[in-house]
């Protein structure tokens, strides 16, 4: 952090959230650009957003890929919107990481005049057309590249999400 290199902390399952957030807040006290992923489907996220704002920690808002406090797809979308509204009203830059076309379109509508305050993040290999189209339209776009020994579990969570979308008659952005 002392060299000014941006540092991002991903979020894992619910049992690790408290310790992960405490670590991020401790690191934030040492300075340097720090971002942490916060999950919309956890009841604690409103408080975590406030703690991050107080500490100057940037947020990458995700819906969540583990078992959270909220399991209903539509309810998670609503929580995502609520948390995004909090981030938007803060006027601090943030990242939205979702492949949900409903949420992406909603955010684009909300942020059209403030493109500099939002970055959209997508998983490598998904939404390539959307990434290219959004970048060409002036949106900040990032690609998340997962790595590490937990590939099978990671892939399983993404497959479960895509299956859920299919059952709802939806699909991720192209």
PLM segments and residue spans:
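Positively charged, amphipathic and often flexible ligand-engagement surfaces
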Residues: 1-174
